[in-house]
């Protein structure tokens, strides 16, 4: 930013779940209202590719193409919603580990935004990062409830 301060980025982990959309909207609205940015992280699970080398490479490329497509679709939605153009980050590995590695490697990421499921469990990523890491997280974590309406998300941002 021009005044010498770092831009705060909101990190969102992208997947195919409905709660991901709530987290995306929250991050985009907060970025819009604070002059920040959004980083969308898509993590491809490596255990999906435990096949013969040629087949594994083809599957890896297909997974990467699907990740790029998903991120592209969401980027269009975010830009239309609030004028935010997010950064993309596609990684392969354990989701929780990749989230932590990205946070450590990008000092501008200031908040991790996660979407919680509507059931009794908030979901595996929320459980893993918040319940197990808790006070050891290097940045604040915002958990957006799965049952929260889009209107309510907009109102609190």
Predicted regions span which residues?
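Short, well-ordered secondary-structure micro-motifs
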Residues: 23, 50-53, 100-101, 124-125, ...
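Small/aliphatic-rich secondary-structure junction motif
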Residues: 2-54, 136-139
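Short, hinge-like loop/turn segments at secondary-structure boundaries
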Residues: 55-59, 104-107, 130
């Amino acid at each position: 930013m021009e005044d010498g301060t770092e831009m705060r980025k909101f990190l969102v982990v992208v997947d195919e779940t409905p709660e991901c959309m709530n987290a995306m909207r929250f991050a985009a609205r907060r970025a819009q209202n604070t002059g920040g940015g959004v980083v969308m992280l898509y993590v491809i699970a490596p255990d999906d590719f435990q096949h013969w080398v040629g087949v594994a490479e083809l599957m890896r490329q297909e997974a990467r193409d699907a990740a790029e497509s998903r991120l592209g679709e969401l980027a269009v939605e975010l830009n239309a919603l609030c004028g935010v153009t997010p950064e993309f980050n596609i990684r392969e590995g354990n989701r929780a580990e990749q989230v932590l590695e990205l946070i450590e490697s990008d000092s501008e990421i200031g908040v991790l935004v996660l979407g919680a499921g509507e059931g009794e469990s908030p979901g595996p990523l929320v459980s893993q990062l918040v319940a197990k890491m808790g006070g050891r997280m290097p940045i604040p974590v915002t958990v957006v409830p799965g049952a929260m309406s889009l209107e309510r998300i907009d109102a609190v941002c």
